[in-house]
Structure formats: structure tokens, C-alpha cells
């Protein structure tokens, strides 16, 4: 894909096409329906569809509609996965903003390493906060997740098991209280009772 602000528009179209694909995988989407879903004029949607088709992401047949190619399916799925992971992440931290809109902005900044890291620290979620299925990771991401899999939530510690704290997701005030009690990054802890 291209770089910069225009790439975000392409990403959004690919993500929306994947969303249509989730609902009806074999259906061609009319440009008018895509334009409506994207909140743009039909001419703008047609222009972007032609652009993405020329890059091999969409199969476009004038007056018949558009659908994802195999390459487009991979790309759209990746964008939707990153969006939904961002929503799960934003739901798990002290955040009062609009989760969906913020996730729309964050998804473009998530690369493979960050996607794998989010997968690990969020416990490989399968649903986003609204109950939508998070698409499965591709093989490259699964391999990275396997490399990073040394992180586990504290709640998974067995009785008598020790671990080192690697990250803490809490408001600064609560985090400070924990740190004053000795629970801080790199501290070794042991689960004594349930």
C-alpha cells in the first residue's frame, strides 16, 4: 500500500470490504452501498475501488459490484483484526474517550510486532468489546506470538509459582500504590494462596 494519510483511506476501505465479506463472503458489494458505509459520495467510492482493484486487492466489475481478492482478503482481515485488538486494548486501560474512533486511528500505527505484543498482553482475545469476532492472526503473527508467549497474566499463576512483573496496566494513582507495596516492574512475586 502507499504511505501516509492516503494509506489510511485505503486501509479504511479494505477494512470495510472485509466487514462486508464477514456478513456475506460470496456477495459482490455495490459501490453505492460501499459509499454509504464509508460516508462518501458514490464517485469517490468508485475512484477508490478502481485504485484498489489496480493494486490487486479488489475484483471490480462495473455495474456488478466489487469483492475482495485473496490478497485483499488477507489485507482487509489484518486491518479488521488490528482495529478490534485496539478496541480490546482501549477497553482494558483507564480510557474515557470514544473507543471505536480511537481504535480507527490506532489501527494504522499497529505493525506486526505491536499486533503480536497486543495479542500476548491481552491474552489472545477472540471477541472485541461489542462481541464481534476478532479475525485469527496470520502465520507470521502467530510465530511472533509464540516468541513473546513468555508473558502471562498474574491471575494465571499457580499456588507456589513465582514470576517477574513485566508490565502493569493501571491508572497512575493505583500503580503508585502498588509500587509502594513492592509491586513494580521487574519485581519477583510468588503466589502464596488463592
Residue positions per predicted region:
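C-terminal regulatory/oligomerization modules of transcriptional regulators
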Residues: 107-170, 193-194
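Short, hydrophobic-biased segments on the C-terminal half of alpha helices
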Residues: 49-50
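Key DNA-contact positions within bacterial/archaeal DNA-binding proteins
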Residues: 43
Amino acid at each position: 500500500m502507499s504511505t501516509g494519510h492516503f494509506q489510511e483511506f485505503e486501509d479504511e476501505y479494505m477494512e470495510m470490504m472485509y466487514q462486508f465479506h464477514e456478513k456475506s463472503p460470496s456477495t459482490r458489494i455495490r459501490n453505492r452501498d460501499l459509499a454509504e458505509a464509508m460516508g462518501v459520495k458514490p464517485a469517490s467510492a468508485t475512484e477508490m475501488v478502481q485504485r484498489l482493484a489496480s493494486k490487486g486487492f479488489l475484483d471490480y466489475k462495473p455495474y456488478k459490484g466489487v469483492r475482495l481478492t485473496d490478497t485483499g482478503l488477507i489485507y482487509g482481515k489484518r486491518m479488521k483484526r488490528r482495529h478490534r485488538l485496539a478496541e480490546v486494548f482501549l477497553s482494558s486501560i483507564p480510557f474515557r474517550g470514544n473507543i471505536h474512533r480511537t481504535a480507527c486511528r490506532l489501527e494504522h500505527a499497529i505493525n506486526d510486532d505491536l499486533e503480536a505484543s497486543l495479542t500476548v498482553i491481552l491474552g489472545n482475545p477472540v471477541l472485541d468489546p461489542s462481541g464481534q469476532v476478532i479475525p485469527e492472526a496470520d502465520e507470521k503473527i502467530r510465530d511472533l506470538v509464540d516468541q513473546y508467549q513468555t508473558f502471562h497474566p498474574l491471575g494465571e499463576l499457580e499456588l507456589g509459582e513465582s514470576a517477574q512483573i513485566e508490565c502493569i496496566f493501571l491508572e497512575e494513582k493505583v500503580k503508585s500504590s502498588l509500587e509502594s507495596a513492592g509491586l513494580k516492574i521487574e519485581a519477583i512475586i510468588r503466589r502464596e494462596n488463592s
